[in-house]
Amino acid sequence: MKQITVALAGQPNVGKSSLINAISNAKLKVGNFSGVTVEKTEVVFTICDEFSCENYETHIIDLPGAYSLTEYTIEEKVTKSFIQSDEYDIIVNVVDSTNLQRNLLFTTQLLETGKKVIVALNMSDEAREEGIEIDEKQLSKILGVPCIKTAASTGEGIDELKEAIVEIYHKKETTAKVIYSDPIEEEIQHIVNFLKEKHYRSKLSYRLLALKLLQEDADIYRKMHDEPIWIEILPLVRDALGHLYLHHNTKDLKEIFEEEHFAFAKGAKMEVMSTKSMKAKNLTQKIDILLINKFLGIPLFLFFMWLLFQLTFELGSIPMDYIDTAFSWMGEQAKL
């Protein structure tokens, strides 16, 4: 039986654990990631591919929730370290469908890793209740990876997710893509053309390699430093970076690519997501709409503060009267 290892990645509170629990006949293993006390959750189950009549032992590693591939927290450090390793075959990026744009910021970083990625648009049922509609097919075209609507609470999309895992597993390389602004795309293309001209052999696609060179990826720089092509490509990369610094008016590459990720996530969201007004709203939503109204919000706040003040003294006077009476009676008794 073939084994598929899946890294389950996503921001905090996107329903990763619920999605794991929704997988039938799951066997849960709990431990720690190597060298740290962060809990490691692993699920083992079997996927039966109906087309090939073959079974796959699938291991899902639930990575700690992270907002980005940085090392600001121990959870992000663990997630980044695992994502950069070769200990898995596929990334399943769990996304909160009710907060698409913010979640896509993390998705763009995962797409840049060069790994095989599947996007699970989780909490789709909650999104529909809020009037949010996402065109998952269009999003799949934009990202270059499968995008599947899931709802852990109802089991929606679980079978489709399993099928996608097997399908992506058999693909030789990822088709993930992130589209950048014209200046960056032009510099990427210049480097790609140079690599093609030199027939450079790389495990990464030329586009991904060019991107990592522009991002000054330490591992790529270390690997290519001792290769003959390094002397020729370094001036090209430096010129490209000079153009980017000039265009973005900063030499902070982190800031440059954060802006690019934000623009890409915002553009993708605007293209695939629509929101319709919901006629039926629950009590909480109705109260929220009333309290955050730009005209009524502040007056209502002041009214409730006044009401709280009045209730504190009016209601508080009742037990105080009883207490005063009790102490007066006790005082009288003491005099006897």
Model features per residue range: what roles?
Residues G35, G65-A66, S97-L100, M123-R128, ...:
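Conserved nucleotide-binding/hydrolysis micro-motifs of P-loop NTPases
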